[in-house]
Amino acid sequence: MRFKLSLKSTHEAIIDDLKEKYSISSNEEVVIRSVKSAFQLENNDLIFATEREQCVGGCFGADPCFDIEMDDTDYNKLKQIFKDYDFEDYDSEEEEVSKTIRCIFNFIEEEPESISI
């Protein structure tokens, strides 16, 4: 599934840091590896069911950054996660999936030892 990923500047900075840390050249590869690593935890509540993931302002401040190709299974898992947790409503499926990915990057920033990409 190809879609446009929307990120905030803080998430773009996290991606840049991860690219440097793991010697990865592509934004897309960082996103894919981060998502897969989050799934391997098999504990969605750890990442998504926290107060820090509920919007307090600027929820819709993310801008489309780049196109990404993700396998359908992972894309559908991200869609389901969005439905399972009490996130704000978004206008499109792409924005909903982007929200779940931003949550993963928030988690990586706060718990860098928990996920290994």
Task: For each feature predicted by the language model, list its residue ranges.
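Surface-exposed, Lys/Arg-rich phosphate-binding patches that contact polyanionic backbones
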Residues: 8-29, 33, 71-95
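Short, basic amphipathic alpha-helical segments that act as recognition/interaction helices
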Residues: 25-50, 89-117
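Short, positively charged interaction helices/loops
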Residues: 40-83, 110-117
